[in-house]
Amino acid sequence: MNIIFPQTYFHHTTISNVDDLRNLKIDESYNVNWAKACSVKVEGLFVDDLIPYIYPVVNNFLKRANISLENFELMQPWKNTYEKGGFQELHDHGDSFLSGCIFLDNPDPDFGNFYFYNRHAVELLKPQRQLLSNLFDSPFLSFVPSVVKGDILIFPSYLMHGVTMHKSEKTRTTISFNIDTL
């Protein structure tokens, strides 16, 4: 089997000092105009506060592709707080280059799950999806990465993703961000 046109990927690693991220200053000027189709508390964070945590991870990821971090910048990051019943609708960040999510809590069985969705799955008949799923021993429609507190995911911004309904009484908190080209 030859694989052509690989375009869906994500980078999964862990950052240290994740507890420090819980107490970052909130940017009160952050204008959230995109959260109408979901149920999540969104608060802007300051870029400079996140750079020490995010840039080393992004730099290591880009180095694998012989790409320099100096051609990119971290855009306005934000904190997501999910209460019981909260969710994030399926979406992408199509105007950016890379997107990411940092998980601030250990998972609970009733926590909402971050997931990736293959937007191209609908282009194939069910037998074709099954064939691809079996050949590559991986899901073809959606994928839920296994994450724990301190994990960070980096993925292309065009990759569809969301968060399933949060059913726990405990809050679920993440930090999201985009990386754009200069």
Show where each model-derived region lies.
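Non-heme Fe(II)/2-oxoglutarate
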Residues: 1-70, 78, 85-87, 113
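A structural signal for short, well-ordered beta-strand segments
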Residues: 77-79, 100-102, 175-179
